[in-house]
Design a protein with these regions (language model features):
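Single conserved hydrophobic/aromatic residue that forms the stacking wall/gate
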Residues: 1-7, 11
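Active-site rim elements
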Residues: 12-15, 101-102
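Active-site metal-binding core of divalent-cation-utilizing nuclease and nuclease-like domains
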Residues: 15-16, 38-74
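Nuclease catalytic cores
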Residues: 17, 21, 25
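Tryptophan-centric aromatic hotspots in well-structured domains and transmembrane helices
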Residues: 20, 36-37, 112
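Conserved catalytic cores of phosphodiester-cleaving nucleases, focusing on short active-site segments
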Residues: 28, 59-63, 73-81, 115
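Short secondary-structure junctions
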Residues: 29-38
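Catalytic cores of nucleic-acid endonucleases
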Residues: 79-135
Length: 135
């Protein structure tokens, strides 16, 4: 395990807001190809479409990976429930739950677009992982 990972009592020091995020931390900790990782260490400014203001987005993870080819690749990773990665179903448009889901999706999409631009500018990759990837 790489010293740069900051391991040991890692789960006391790292931020995770879901068990899925914790599961990803354990994966990072046990994967010898992951040379560095951190939780909510990167700050990406984005303009929120719901209020028009600039906010700060803290993606869930940063990782540095040694690919099979030997190339080093950096990733910014967001862990999200799959249902939050696509627009809500239009059939529910009149409900308060639909309105909340639509606002959440619009805000998330703005964050992810900003993250994609941030990563492209820095030769990094942006990934959204869902339960399909973690289980």
């Amino acid at each position: 395990k790489a010293e740069s990972r900051g391991l040991g009592d890692v789960y006391k020091r790292q931020i995770y807001r879901s068990l899925w995020e914790r599961k990803f931390m354990v994966f990072c900790d046990n994967n010898p190809s992951i040379l560095e990782w951190g939780s909510e260490e990167v700050i990406i400014p984005y303009r929120c479409p719901t209020d028009g203001r600039v906010h700060r987005y803290y993606p869930d993870f940063y990782i540095k990976v040694r690919e099979k080819s030997g190339k080093l690749t950096k990733y910014i990773i967001e862990v999200k429930p799959k249902k939050q990665t696509s627009p809500p179903h239009a059939k529910d448009k009149r409900t308060a739950a639909y309105r909340r889901a639509a606002l959440t999706f619009a805000k998330n999409r703005a964050k992810w677009n900003a993250a994609q631009d941030f990563c492209e500018d820095r030769q990094m990759n942006f990934l959204i992982l869902t339960e399909d990837h973690l289980f």
